[in-house]
C-alpha cells in the first residue's frame, strides 16, 4: 500500500508521510507522485528532495523499504530532476521507483536503461499493443485515460490484470525469453524490491501463491492463493456474496 497522490503536497492518512509509514503497517511508501505529466503539480527539486528525505527516514524508523513511486509523464525533461537529486545528494537510488517508463516514447525508455544500469528500479506498463506510444515490445496493470485530439478527457478506464500474464507470454513465445527470466518481472523482482515477506518465491514456509500454466501456450490453468485453490480449468472460487451482485 502507498500513501500519497499525483500532486505535491501529497495526501496522507495521518497528516505526515513519516507517520503513515511508522503507524500504518501496510504503508510501504508514497505514490504515485506525478512528474513531467499534465496532471502533476510540477514540483521543484527541493519539494521532491524533501519528500524523498521523509520517505527514507520513515522507512528507516519503520523497517520498511521507504520508496516513492514516481508516475512519469512525457515531458521533454524526462527524469532530469531525479538525476540531479541522485548526483547532488546522498539519497540512495533505491528510494526512487519509476513507473510507465515503457509507454512514453523511446527517449524515456533509454533513460530507464541508464537508470537500471545505475542500480535503480523501474516498472513497465503491460499495455495492449495498440495503446503503446513506442515501438518497443508490449510492456503492469494501470489506469487507461482516453483523450480527444484537443487533450480533453473523454473516458477513464482500467486495464485488466491479465495483461501482466500476456506480457510474460509475449516475452517467452514471441521474443524467446527463458520463462524463468520473464516471470521475474511480475513475481520475484517486485517482492524482493519492496521486501514482501514470504512472497515471490516457491520456498518452504513462504505463502503458497502459485499459478500453473499450460506448458505449450502458457495459458492459465490453476491459481492457488496462500495454499487455497482459487481456480482450476473448469471452476473458479467465488466470494460468498458474489452471486448476489450478478443480479443487481
Where are these regions (language model features)?
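Divalent-metal coordination cores built from histidine and acidic residues
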Residues: 1-47
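Short intrinsically disordered, low-complexity coil segments enriched in acidic
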Residues: 1-7, 12, 138, 143-168
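Fold-independent oxyanion-binding glycine-rich loops
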Residues: 2-5, 30-35, 72-73, 100-101, ...
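Active-site microenvironment of metallo-dependent hydrolases
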Residues: 3-4, 155-248
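Short secondary-structure capping/turn micro-motifs that flank functional sites
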Residues: 7-10, 131-132, 188
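Short low-complexity, flexible loop/linker segments enriched in glycine and/or proline
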Residues: 14-18, 137-140, 227-230
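Short coil/turn connectors at secondary-structure junctions
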Residues: 24-28, 62-65, 93-94, 118, ...
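Active-site core of metal-dependent hydrolases
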Residues: 39-40, 47, 52-147, 154
Amino acid at each position: 500500500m502507498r500513501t500519497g497522490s499525483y500532486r505535491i503536497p501529497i495526501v496522507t492518512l495521518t497528516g505526515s508521510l513519516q507517520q503513515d509509514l511508522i503507524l500504518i503497517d501496510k504503508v510501504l511508501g508514497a505514490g504515485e507522485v506525478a512528474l513531467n505529466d499534465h496532471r502533476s503539480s510540477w514540483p521543484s527539486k527541493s519539494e521532491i528532495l524533501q519528500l524523498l528525505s521523509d520517505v527514507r527516514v520513515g522507512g528507516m524508523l519503520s523497517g520498511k523499504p521507504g520508496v516513492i513511486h514516481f508516475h512519469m509523464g512525457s515531458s521533454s525533461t524526462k527524469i532530469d530532476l531525479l538525476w540531479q537529486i541522485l548526483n547532488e545528494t546522498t539519497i540512495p537510488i533505491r528510494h526512487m521507483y519509476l513507473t510507465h517508463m515503457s509507454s512514453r516514447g523511446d527517449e524515456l525508455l533509454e533513460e530507464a536503461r541508464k537508470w537500471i544500469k545505475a542500480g535503480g528500479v523501474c516498472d513497465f506498463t503491460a499495455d495492449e499493443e495498440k495503446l503503446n506510444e513506442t515501438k518497443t515490445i508490449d510492456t503492469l496493470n494501470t489506469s487507461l485515460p482516453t483523450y480527444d485530439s484537443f487533450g480533453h478527457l473523454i473516458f477513464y478506464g482500467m486495464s485488466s490484470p491479465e495483461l501482466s500474464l500476456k506480457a510474460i507470454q509475449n516475452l517467452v513465445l514471441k521474443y524467446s525469453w527463458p520463462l524463468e527470466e520473464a516471470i521475474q518481472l511480475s513475481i520475484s523482482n517486485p517482492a524482493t524490491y519492496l521486501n514482501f515477506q514470504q512472497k515471490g518465491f516457491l520456498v518452504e514456509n513462504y505463502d503458497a501463491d502459485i499459478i500453473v500454466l499450460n506448458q505449450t501456450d502458457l495459458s492459465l490453468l490453476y491459481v492457488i492463493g496462500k495454499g487455497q485453490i482459487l481456480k482450476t480449468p473448469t471452476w473458479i472460487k467465488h466470494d460468498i456474496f458474489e452471486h448476489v451482485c450478478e443480479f443487481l
